[in-house]
């Protein structure tokens, strides 16, 4: 259990305060994460890694010479926002471009690609790459669907060494692709991990068993097996990884036996003795192995085995020196191109027109209703946090409730601030959407941000939107989710509640029903649709590898969307009664 914290909701922020103070020789804080304490030298590609926290030393612990130039730090097991990723990349960038790289998770892929788009619009050359090493998360031939777990480390290390050597951005991306194609990982869990403040783990493993094929975000394994001896575990891991080996003739391999947070180093060394013997018996030469904690999952008990097949180039980068807070190899040279950073900051946005200048009285009246709706949503989601987390943990990482609370709380504050500045309903929704995406992180954060900003763009800041405009705004929101999320109705996502909600609202509005009444009826339809997702199997996201396990449990994203729709309906009813 994660026992030491102040406010569980601020665990990541509090962790960063201590980390930065303890490692000021290596890193400084910037909005969204950390960068090297020394500026990036001219001509060097900046490598920015990242993801949710809870994996230390991944990701902030490997920022320094020979490794990453920056790390984007999200909330526990939650993708950082696009704004945070872009902020860290700007701070790390010198003049040769930026590679942003993460494990292959929907939220990271969405947010970091959005960050790349933003950086390119500012004239910064940027690329994104996702690691896909987890052999348990998708079958051979479907490698693009695989998660990134401890193989993140080998890919990040080689790409960073290539950048340190002076390769251009295309060359660094090529090395990342080669390292990823050569890397395979299989993990096991003996017990689940517990989020700060929670009184139970995200999953449990029956006594005397282990979960095979775990994820690093608290996702349980894809199957359960009886707990073997150390020798038996070594054989399971070696057979699993080598059984999926790439079509490569190389017999020289980099190997990581990675602890997940609670498994003792002494235990890992016992297992390593067996792993190394099995690999050598099969004719492999092990190059500079790593045994220890490199990519963890809070206090999860378990370990994983990673193998990267080495050609001459990858071996050079794997063996290259590095000097970071948590990982050191050889003697890495400090490249200083100027004064030591005191702090790097993201570019400040230019100020636009004052919000009050864009609105009229009707728009400001609508803004007051929108702000009240965000108040109500934040309270409803706070009450539902534990249940949403429980639903999400059945086949996912259990962070949905916490992410929705952080997002809705940030949206509530942003809406209130915009309202105080005289904003109309469109600007209030826009501000709330941006805040939700920035603070919630993860897949749901970026999707809710897109939903709210699309709705706000349609409603505008002047006049009182009629029922047809509101229905069109909801359709715009749905279309934004389709464009950004890559999911479709039936995939067991929030779309399975959003589409019925949208269609019912449109149908009733087309029959001249008031939007208030239509919204209530549509919310009821969305609630039933969310419940019906219990019968679906997820086809996208972290729950996909555990699709069968999720049957019988509704989708957390659909459930929370329906809850928000009902809450808005209640808020509208109260407001209407107040006017009467």
Curated annotation (Swiss-Prot):
Q: Could you tell me which residues belong to the region Disordered?
A: 329-360
Q: Which reaction does it catalyse?
A: D-erythrulose + ATP = D-erythrulose 4-phosphate + ADP + H(+)
All copies of domain DhaL, residue ranges: 368-570
- If you read the UniProt record, what top EC class would you report for this enzyme, in one word? transferase
Active-site residue list: 217 (tele-hemiaminal-histidine intermediate)
Amino acids binding ATP: 397-403, 443-444, 485, 542, 555-557
Q: In which pathway does it act?
A: Carbohydrate metabolism; erythritol degradation; Carbohydrate metabolism; D-threitol degradation
Q: Which residues form a coiled coil?
A: none
What is an annotated GO biological process for this record, any one? cellular response to carbohydrate stimulus
One GO MF term attached to the UniProt entry: ATP binding
Q: What happens when the gene is disrupted?
A: Cells lacking this gene are defective for growth with D-threitol and are totally unable to grow on erythritol.
Domain annotation DhaK: ranges: 7-327
Keyword Amino-acid biosynthesis attached: no
> Which InterPro entries does this chain map to?
DhaK_dom, DhaL_dom, DhaL_dom_sf, Dihydroxyacetone_Kinase
Its name, as the record gives it, is D-erythrulose kinase
Species of origin? Mycolicibacterium smegmatis (strain ATCC 700084 / mc(2)155) (Mycobacterium smegmatis)
Taxonomy, top ranks, is: Bacteria, Bacillati, Actinomycetota, Actinomycetes, Mycobacteriales
Gene name, per UniProt, is: derK
């Amino acid at each position: 259990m994660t026992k030491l914290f102040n406010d569980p909701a601020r665990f990541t922020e509090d962790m960063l305060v201590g980390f930065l103070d303890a490692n000021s020789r290596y890193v400084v804080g910037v909005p969204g994460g950390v960068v090297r304490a020394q500026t990036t030298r001219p001509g060097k590609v900046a490598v920015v890694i990242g993801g949710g926290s809870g994996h230390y030393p991944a990701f902030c612990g490997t920022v320094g010479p020979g490794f990453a130039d920056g790390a984007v730090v999200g909330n526990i097991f939650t993708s950082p926002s696009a704004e945070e990723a872009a902020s860290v990349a700007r701070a790390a960038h010198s003049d040769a471009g930026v590679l942003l790289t993460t494990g292959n998770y929907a939220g990271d892929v969405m947010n970091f690609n959005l960050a790349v788009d933003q950086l390119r619009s500012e004239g910064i050359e940027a690329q994104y790459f996702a690691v896909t090493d987890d052999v348990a998360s998708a079958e051979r031939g479907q490698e693009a669907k695989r998660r990134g777990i401890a193989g993140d480390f080998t890919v990040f290390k080689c790409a960073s060494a290539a950048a340190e050597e002076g390769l251009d951005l295309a060359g660094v991306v090529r090395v990342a692709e080669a390292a990823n194609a050569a890397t395979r990982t299989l993990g096991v869990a003996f017990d689940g991990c517990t989020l700060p403040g929670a009184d139970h783990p995200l999953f449990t493993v029956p006594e005397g068993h282990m979960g095979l094929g775990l994820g690093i975000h608290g996702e349980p394994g894809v199957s359960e097996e009886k707990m073997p001896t150390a020798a038996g575990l070594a054989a399971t891991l070696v057979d699993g990884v080598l059984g999926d080996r790439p079509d490569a003739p190389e017999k020289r391999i980099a190997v990581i036996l990675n602890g997940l947070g609670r498994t003792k180093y002494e235990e890992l060394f016992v297992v390593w003795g067996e792993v190394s013997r099995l690999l050598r018996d099969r004719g492999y030469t092990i190059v500079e192995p790593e045994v220890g904690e490199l990519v963890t999952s809070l206090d999860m008990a378990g370990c994983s085995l990673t193998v990267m097949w080495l050609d001459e180039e990858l071996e050079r980068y794997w063996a290259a020196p590095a000097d970071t807070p948590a990982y050191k190899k050889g003697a890495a040279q400090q490249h200083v191109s100027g004064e030591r950073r005191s702090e790097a900051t993201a570019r400040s946005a230019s100020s636009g027109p004052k919000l009050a200048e864009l609105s009229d009285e009707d728009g400001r009246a609508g803004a007051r209703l929108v702000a009240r709706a965000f108040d109500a949503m934040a309270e409803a989601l706070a009450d539902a946090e534990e249940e949403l987390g429980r639903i999400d943990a059945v086949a996912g990482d259990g962070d949905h409730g916490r992410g929705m609370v952080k997002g809705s709380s940030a949206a509530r504050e942003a809406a209130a601030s915009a309202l105080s500045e005289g904003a109309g309903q469109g600007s209030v929704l826009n501000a709330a959407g941006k805040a939700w995406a920035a603070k919630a992180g993860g897949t749901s954060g970026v999707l809710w941000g897109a939903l709210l900003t699309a709705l706000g763009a349609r409603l505008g800041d002047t006049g009182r939107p009629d029922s047809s405009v509101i229905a069109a705004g909801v359709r715009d929101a749905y279309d934004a989710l389709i464009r950004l999320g890559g999911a479709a109705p039936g995939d067991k996502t929030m779309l399975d509640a959003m589409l019925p909600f949208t269609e019912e609202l449109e149908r009733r509005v087309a029959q001249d029903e008031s939007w208030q009444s239509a919204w209530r009826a549509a919310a009821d339809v969305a609630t039933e649709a969310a419940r019906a997702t219990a019968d679906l199997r997820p086809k996208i996201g972290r729950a996909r590898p555990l699709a069968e396990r999720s049957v019988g449990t509704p989708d957390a994203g659909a459930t929370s969307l329906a809850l928000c729709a009902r809450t808005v309906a209640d808020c509208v009813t109260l407001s209407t009664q107040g006017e009467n």
